[in-house]
Amino acid sequence: MSISVMANSHLNQPYASASPTPQEKGRTCRYAGQAVRALPIRVITVGKKRSEGVRLLVDEYKIKLKPYCSFEDSLVRSNPRNAQDVRAQVEDEEVAMMKLIGSDDWVVVLDERGRDIDSEQMAELLGDAGNSGASRISFCIGGAYGHGTQVRKRANVTIRLSSMVLNHQIALVVLMEQLYRSWTILKGQNYHH
């Protein structure tokens, strides 16, 4: 099954950069306290070997996420053929990333040009994905030169974690924390306030 219809029109504008309006700030997630289908989550990151500190934080959040959903962390080697040309490097990384994205995955691309969302909207994103009919959510963190065209086109949603460019290791840690925070929002737990 291929997911070709965008599950949520307010989140699928690939390069919109609108921040939440003042009316949206302080609002609650529309799925809070409701049953949400917990899809397995896969985070696909392009990069090199992770630092010990990042590995420890990722492992900590994997444990925290365990009660909510299954989680898989996949690392795609950056510049696998040591290409000198940036375009060739991005294409090689893209091929490896696309092999990890299933045809029925709900794909979230993290990109500096993506939509700026808050924590409640991230929780809603998880709820929307759970209601989409997809079998898994795949979050894609690109390499030093970003994502290739195929990955961008495959995205159901394109978001950014910050207006600043983040190193892939920092982006991974921020994403992991936000995934945990999102689940606590969905479950009405006290972590988020």
UniProtKB/Swiss-Prot annotation:
EC number(s) on file: 2.1.1.-
Keywords tagged on the record: Methyltransferase, S-adenosyl-L-methionine, Transferase
Transmembrane segments: none
Binding of S-adenosyl-L-methionine, residues: L110, G142, L161, S162, S163, M164, V165, L166
Record carries keyword Zinc: no
Enzyme class per UniProt: transferase
Origin: domain of life: Eukaryota
Pfam families, per database record: SPOUT_MTase (PF02590)
GO BP annotations, alphabetical order: methylation; rRNA processing
GO molecular function: methyltransferase activity
InterPro entries assigned to the protein according to its UniProt record, in alphabetical order: Alpha/beta_knot_MTases, RlmH-like, tRNA_m1G_MTases_N
Family: Belongs to the RNA methyltransferase RlmH family.
Family annotation (HAMAP family): 23SrRNA_methyltr_H (MF_00658)
Protein name as it appears in the record: Putative RNA methyltransferase At5g10620
